[in-house]
């Protein structure tokens, strides 16, 4: 059985918004709850995430953990045999410098992997140890 004292408002209760700057008796008059001077009292001020009032923030107090190799990792790019067919002539030497000159790879690239997409139409000379051939490309070259 429902009792009268157990009835609840079906809609979520909403707190009435405080009126700011409406006299001293409101508790939010004059400075409107912003205090005197400083950044927070100015218009347009938004506190940066993690800001702790000028003290050293938590993310700088806590020691860093681990180590990332991202800065030191070697940049590796992939090239397909189809692309090599388009770029190089028959009997051409394939090296990192040759690929960089033709702007096929970035300047920072230190290693290239050749992947089989189509059969190589041309006989190419592999000059650089930094160019790694996939198993499919190796078997294709050995067959020719």
From Swiss-Prot:
Superkingdom of source: Bacteria
Membrane-traversing stretches: none
Renumbered residue ranges of the record's region Disordered: 1-48
Coiled-coil region: none
SUPFAM superfamilies: Ribosomal proteins L15p and L18e
A single GO BP: translation
GO molecular function: rRNA binding; structural constituent of ribosome
GO cellular component, one term: cytosolic large ribosomal subunit
Keyword presence, Ribonucleoprotein: yes
Keywords from the named record: Ribonucleoprotein, Ribosomal protein, RNA-binding, rRNA-binding
Ribonucleoprotein as UniProt keyword: yes
Subunit structure: Part of the 50S ribosomal subunit.
Assigned protein family: Belongs to the universal ribosomal protein uL15 family.
Function: Binds to the 23S rRNA.
Protein name: Large ribosomal subunit protein uL15
Organism: Chlamydia trachomatis serovar L2b (strain UCH-1/proctitis)
